[in-house]
Amino acid sequence: MFPSNLREIVEATYEKAVANGHVKFTESSSKKLKDVDAGISYQVTFAPSLQSKPERLPIAIDENGAPIPKKDPFAEPEPELTILDDCAGDYKLLLNKYPVAANHLILVTKKYLLQTAPLSPKDLLTTYKLLQELDDEDEMLRHLAFYNCGPNSGSSQDHKHLQILPLPYKFVPYQDKLCSGKEHFIPNAKTEPLQDAKIPFAHYAVPLPEDPEKVDEDLLAMTFVSLLQRTLSMFQDWEGSNAEKSNDDEASIPAYNVLMTKEWLCLVPRSKAFAETPSIGFNATGYAGLVLVKWDETLKVLNENPSAVTKLLLECSFPSTAGAKPTEYHY
């Protein structure tokens, strides 16, 4: 499906694009923190130069009050950023033009589809196969794929795309520990997805088969749909108890993050993209423990109290349902 030397192609294209100025690498510094109570390890990356870069551009309006379509950066991607112009037939594989981590990839649909659409079986399998090709277990190089679905998920572009980036060396997302040693299963009314009871925000995880030969479109699709049904039930519960708050267009669109490694698939329902005090925005990477900070005052708060990271993640998501008895309503 992909060139056998894909990782080498990515690295060479990235290095050339940085050298020629087509990729604008964001300088940053990183520090590891741990919320002992929740058992979550965080890597907090401080990138103050991003203060001037908006998370998501507001909708522009013309003189008649009609919305002006935003430019689609994926419609005609720069050749210097293109890894594969034809990836599995329906996609292009590109470099992120403004990465904080080296070799940050974007898997974008050739056809214009909306970022509010769920992942298709082919989206899932293509992503899994890319993770297979990019990971190097001998060198402890692992990758995280993620999808920010909906305005409150932390998405910044409306053209459907997934992203893939290398995990920091020896970094262990909480999903690793949650899924370690467990067999794959399809969640249902009798068997809930895995959640860590110590973590206060809802996160629905399922281990994937250890044998990659057992991972196909059907297995990934059934797993994803089951997790999605459980995730969407959170919004039904929330809208029922917050009817007066449901008039906001963006708030009424279900938003969630999808996170995937070769070992597991995880969905996190999202209530909003930004926490206000201190100021910080999260996309899917935050819910793997990779947190990006732009402001000194935010960094100071997190350094002084790592549990503040977990509280901010909860503010932008929903409370955990660990231990709650599932019903047919949730599936």
From Swiss-Prot:
Keyword hit for Cytoplasm: yes
Gene3D superfamilies: 3.30.428.70
Catalytic activity: ADP + ATP + H(+) = P(1),P(4)-bis(5'-adenosyl) tetraphosphate + phosphate; sulfate + ADP + H(+) = adenosine 5'-phosphosulfate + phosphate
Top-level taxon of origin: Eukaryota
Active site: 161
Subunit structure: Monomer.
Protein name: Diadenosine 5',5'''-P1,P4-tetraphosphate phosphorylase 2
Organism: Kluyveromyces lactis (strain ATCC 8585 / CBS 2359 / DSM 70799 / NBRC 1267 / NRRL Y-1140 / WM37)
